[in-house]
UniProtKB/Swiss-Prot annotation:
One of its GO terms (molecular function) is metal ion binding. Its cofactor is heme b. The keyword Cell inner membrane does not apply. It comes from Fukomys darlingi (Mashona mole rat). Gene3D superfamilies: Cytochrome Bc1 Complex, Chain C. Disulfide bonds: none annotated. Keywords: Electron transport, Heme, Iron, Membrane, Metal-binding, Mitochondrion, Mitochondrion inner membrane, Respiratory chain, Transmembrane, Transmembrane helix, Transport, Ubiquinone. The keyword Transport applies. InterPro entries: Cyt_b/b6_C, Cyt_b/b6_C_sf, Cyt_b/b6_N, Cytb/b6-like_sf, Cytochrome_b, Cytochrome_b_C_euk/bac, Cytochrome_b_N_euk/bac, Di-haem_cyt_TM. A ubiquinone binds at residue 201. Belongs to the cytochrome b family. The cytochrome bc1 complex contains 11 subunits: 3 respiratory subunits (MT-CYB, CYC1 and UQCRFS1), 2 core proteins (UQCRC1 and UQCRC2) and 6 low-molecular weight proteins (UQCRH/QCR6, UQCRB/QCR7, UQCRQ/QCR8, UQCR10/QCR9, UQCR11/QCR10 and a cleavage product of UQCRFS1). This cytochrome bc1 complex then forms a dimer. This is Cytochrome b.
Length: 379
């Protein structure tokens, strides 16, 4: 008799995706982050569902409902902080996942890569809307500033902003619709993730060497299930340490003050995982220019396959490209720091130089260095 996992229509899909999936034998721990993102997504959906049971999307009660969750609901504080810090873990995994894709040339799987970019946009939008829900000072002013960026769009900008707000300012209508979208988006993200995996399994996984691995594949289970489980444990320990010892470490103290449209915080800034984008936005003194730079800083990922001039797929054997890659990482960390600083000298100048360097490395230096490496290898 055939094994049920190989004959049952539903089990067969799971079997081909997670059990008997032929996987390159040499993929490193950098490949763990895809499965970690899946776990983060499940964790966010579960904790978010329980939070939604007690949260009220109304400007008069939103802030106090979050306080009620922390004080009166059984383990409400735990659910709330796992959700808030889970978002941070989500973005750490997301950025490492994208970084690994750039380093090892995974962007050459065009469909998977483009689907991943759509997922990145979706997760960013969801996180932004979630940050507005506690209705603290930073929630309110963050929503006001970021949605206001759309007013930079010529001709339709102002109408578009008022349409999103549902009025002439961020108010009850805005909060209600943000809650509705924040609730539905994770399920859309789950569906997009299935498509992302579908495209990936059409081609099979890339590997650190960047060369075809069809001659050397091993089953996903038990080799990579046990390896992924090790990754889960690491992330779980870090998340729990954060939640139980310093749950507000990555948050903003201003968000413990109820939203007040008449009082602007001295320094409006988004969550830490958006700070480098925010620094790029601020580095251009023109509103439309800043918005364009912000959008292009993410959209630039789409043209990654077109900028690939090397004869080798991976950076594993390309030391000059490796140096550039780590320069890019250091530059993004600098931008993250700049985004958290006030708009004054020398932060403005450092931000402008770092923003310029970000685009220069990706658009000019990486393709040029790849061509130089080809020449050095007489290819």
């Amino acid at each position: 008799m055939t094994n049920i996992r190989k004959s049952h229509p539903l089990m067969k899909i799971i079997n081909h995706s997670f059990i008997d999936l032929p996987t390159p034998s040499n993929i490193s721990s950098w490949w763990n982050f895809g499965s970690l993102l899946g776990i983060c997504l499940i964790l966010q959906i579960v904790t978010g569902l329980f939070l939604a049971m007690h949260y009220t999307a109304d400007t008069t009660t939103a802030f106090s409902s979050v306080a009620h969750i922390c004080r009166d609901v059984n383990y409400g504080w735990l659910i709330r902080y796992v959700h808030a810090n889970g978002a941070s873990m989500f973005f750490i995994c997301l950025y490492v996942h994208v970084g690994r894709g750039i380093y090892y040339g995974s962007y050459m799987f065009m469909e998977t890569w483009n689907m991943g970019i759509i997922l990145l946009f979706s997760v960013m939008a969801t996180a932004f809307m979630g940050y507005v829900l506690p209705w603290g000072q930073m929630s309110f002013w963050g929503a006001t500033v970021i949605t206001n960026l759309l007013s930079a769009i010529p001709y339709i900008g102002t109408s578009l902003v008022e349409w999103i707000w549902g009025g002439f300012s961020v108010d009850k209508a805005t909060l209600t619709r943000f809650f509705a979208f924040h609730f539905i988006m994770p399920f859309i993200i789950t569906a997009l993730t299935v498509v992302h995996l579908l495209f990936l399994h059409e081609t099979g996984s890339n590997n650190p060497s960047g060369i075809d691995s069809n001659s050397d594949k091993i089953p996903f289970h038990p080799y990579y299930t046990i390896k992924d489980f090790m990754g889960f444990l690491f992330v779980f320990v870090i998340l729990l340490t954060l939640v139980l010892f310093s749950p507000d470490l990555l948050g903003d103290p201003d968000n413990y003050t109820p939203a007040n449209p008449l009082n602007t915080p001295s320094h409006i800034k988004p969550e830490w995982y958006f700070l480098f984008r925010y620094a790029i936005l601020r580095s251009i003194p023109n509103k439309l220019g800043g918005v364009l730079a912000l959008v292009l800083s993410i959209m630039i990922l789409i043209i990654m396959p077109l900028l690939h001039t090397s004869k080798q797929r991976s950076m594993m054997f390309r030391p000059m490209s490796q140096c550039l890659f780590w320069m890019l990482v250091a530059n993004l960390l600098t931008l993250t720091w700049i985004g958290s600083q006030p708009v004054e000298h020398p932060y403005v100048l450092i931000g402008q130089l770092s923003s310029m360097l970000y685009f220069t490395i990706i658009l000019i230096l990486m393709p040029l260095v790849s061509m130089m490496e080809n020449k050095m290898l007489k290819w």
